[in-house]
Regions:
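Long, low-complexity, Ser/Thr- and acidic/proline-rich intrinsically disordered regions
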Residues: 1-11, 18, 23, 295, ...
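Cullin-RING E3 adaptor/co-adaptor recruitment helices
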Residues: 2-140
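Leucine-rich repeat domain C-terminal region
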Residues: 5-50, 524-534, 547-582
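Short, solvent-exposed loop/turn at the beta-strand->alpha-helix junction
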Residues: 95-101, 121-126, 146-153, 171-176, ...
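Alpha-solenoid helical-repeat scaffolds
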Residues: 95-209, 213-219, 228-232, 239
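Conserved hydrophobic beta-strand positions in leucine-rich repeat
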Residues: 113-118, 139-143, 163-168, 187-193, ...
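Leucine-rich repeat
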Residues: 134-135, 158-160, 181-187, 206-210, ...
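Ankyrin-repeat and related helical/solenoid repeat scaffolds used for protein-protein interactions
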Residues: 452, 459, 476, 483, ...
Length: 582
């Protein structure tokens, strides 16, 4: 029973993604975000670690743990149990949302190593007494999104063996509560993501955490002036300060001696080219994120000396062509994000030698067919983002040799149906975005040989019921968006057998009726469904009863009422988290 004790503890702090709001009839990007952020259901948890194939069944240990959890009210203490067993029972109660303040008491003095209560409801200071009772056995604690305050934090003072602590979104913890951290010198991972209590003054406590390897301060907007307290944390390998909006060049100079840094996240900070110049000595840096910072191509001179760099994000910066020759020195780059900059075809000349690139984002840049020819030698490319560029059908011929390409975004480009023949030759493609009014049934028909597609975005394409026949060829589709307004119930018949679908967006097809809901009633893997702006009514909701995995349902601007949607969730689809109308 050494599984819990022996698990690896050197994992990176999860940096997550920024929350985004979506317009009413938005593309399914909002649904994709939702899929990543949804909590697991009880059914998800019950399958964890259990075989799902024929003849497989839970292990004896799993059965014992499940039975103890079921009868948890019968027990007063687990101190006599082996630590691994107590740990498994605790984890199971948390995963199934069955842990209460009362049942938590049974784990007092059980020498648990991991207390993961992140986003768990009801966690407060009173719970921390049991957490702290694990004393020096305690190695990791997660109380993110809790009501724990300074008092609760102070109770952890004697748990000196803690290596990992996550207090994300803990608004009740002030700079006073941070003071107790100074004694936790064994901490290697610390996360206070979007916590208002983290201030420049409060960061004094970090100065003693000399063993820190991972530090996440994302969204802590009051830390300007506090980075001086990090200057001696020379073991730091990852530092996340995304959306710390007031971090300036004067702060970055205190990072110059952190030469072991491998991952530095600085998006949306007040950093200029001067601030980037302080990073010159970080020879081990592999990931650098400067998205949304007021830097120019002049910063590339300093960045070009970061020989270990494999990922560089300059999205939404002020990059022009001048200075882009410095990209040529970044030979190890695998990921380069230049979206929403002012670069033109002239910049792409300097990318052609970056032969290790696997992902390239040129979204909304001023590039066209002439520049695309410089990408033809990047044969390791797996993802290419060309949305909102002037790339047309002629430019696609230069991509024919990119046999490893798995994802391409051609939304809002000048590409037409003729170009689809060239795309169809890229047999490794899994994801294709053709949100483009110039794409019609003819172009879709040219793609039917791409039977391995898992994601197909035809949001604004002019696909009719005739073209919808092509959907039968894409048996592996997990995500489909077809919202051009020309699909009727007849076209949906070609979707009803795509059993792998988890996301389906049919919004803005105004002629869809309740028959559509009947046709897709067998797509039981669906997690997100959007049939907004259609003729669907309350009467059609009965067809959704078997879609038990559904978490998001959007039926805005239909004949469905909010009251009926609420009834649907209460009586039929209890796992629904997001629904419209509401």
């Amino acid at each position: 029973m050494g599984g819990v004790c022996s698990r690896k503890r050197s994992q990176l702090v999860d940096e997550g993604d920024s929350f985004q709001t979506s317009p009413r009839f938005s593309k399914t990007s909002s649904l994709k975000w939702l899929l990543l952020s949804l909590p697991r259901t009880n059914s998800d948890v019950s399958r964890k670690g259990q075989g799902e194939g024929p003849g497989q069944c839970p292990s004896l240990m799993e059965l014992c743990v499940a039975r103890v959890c079921k009868d948890i009210d019968k027990y007063s203490s687990f101190t006599i149990l082996p630590r691994d067993l107590s740990q498994q029972i605790f984890n199971k109660l948390v995963e199934s949302n069955c842990l209460t303040e009362a049942s938590l008491q049974t784990f007092r003095d059980c020498a648990l190593q991991d207390i993961c209560l992140g986003e768990y409801p009801g966690v407060k200071d009173a719970w921390m007494e049991v957490v702290a009772s694990q004393r020096k056995s305690l190695l990791s604690v997660d109380i993110s999104c809790s009501e724990v305050s300074d008092s609760g934090m102070d109770i952890l003072r004697d748990c000196s063996s803690i290596q990992s602590l996550a207090c994300n979104y803990c608004d009740q913890i002030s700079e006073n509560g941070l003071g107790m951290l100074s004694g936790l010198s064994n901490l290697t991972s610390l996360s206070f993501k979007r916590s208002n209590g983290v201030t420049a003054e409060g960061m004094r406590a970090f100065a003693n955490l000399i063993n820190l390897v991972h530090l996440n301060l994302e969204g802590c907007v009051k830390i300007h002036g506090g980075l001086i307290h990090l200057k001696d944390l020379t073991k730091l390998e990852s530092l996340n300060m995304r959306y710390c909006n007031y971090i300036a060049d004067s702060d970055i100079k205190y990072l110059t001696d952190l030469t072991n840094l491998k991952d530095l996240q600085l998006s949306c900070c007040r950093i200029t080219d001067l601030g980037v110049s302080y990073l010159r000595g970080m020879s081990k840096l592999t990931h650098l994120n400067l998205e949304g910072c007021a830097v120019t191509a002049a910063c590339l001179e300093a960045i070009s000396g970061l020989a270990s760099l494999i990922s560089l994000n300059l999205n939404r910066c002020g990059i022009y062509d001048d200075g882009c020759e410095n990209f040529e020195g970044l030979k190890k780059l695998k990921t380069l994000n230049l979206g929403f900059n002012y670069i033109t075809d002239a910049c792409l000349v300097h990318l052609k030698e970056l032969i290790n690139l696997e992902s390239l984002n040129l979204d909304s840049c001023k590039i066209g067919d002439e520049g695309i020819q410089h990408l033809k030698g990047l044969v390791l490319l797996q993802s290419l983002e060309l949305s909102d560029t002037e790339v047309g059908t002629n430019g696609l011929q230069h991509l024919s040799g990119l046999r490893n390409l798995q994802s391409i975004n051609l939304s809002f480009t000048l590409v037409t149906d003729i170009g689809m023949k060239k795309i169809s030759m890229l047999n490794s493609l899994k994801s294709v975005n053709l949100d483009n009014r110039q794409i019609t049934d003819v172009g879709l028909a040219a793609l039917t040989s791409l039977t391995g597609l898992t994601h197909l975005d035809l949001f604004g394409a002019r696909i009719t019921d005739y073209g919808a026949n092509c959907f039968r060829c894409f048996k592996n589709l997990k995500s489909l968006e077809v919202c051009g307004g020309f699909i009727t119930d007849a076209g949906v018949k070609n979707i009803k057998d795509l059993k792998a679908l988890t996301q389906l967006n049919l919004s803005q097809n105004v002629n869809l009726t309740d028959k559509t809901l009947e046709l897709i009633s067998g797509l039981t893997a669906l997690v997100c469904l959007n049939v907004s702006n259609s003729r669907v009514s309350n009467a059609g909701l009965k067809h959704l009863k078997d879609l038990q995995n559904l978490r998001s349902l959007s039926l805005d601007s239909t004949r469905v009422t909010a009251n009926e949607m609420k009834k649907l969730r209460v009586t039929t689809l209890p796992n629904l988290i997001s629904m419209r109308p509401e």
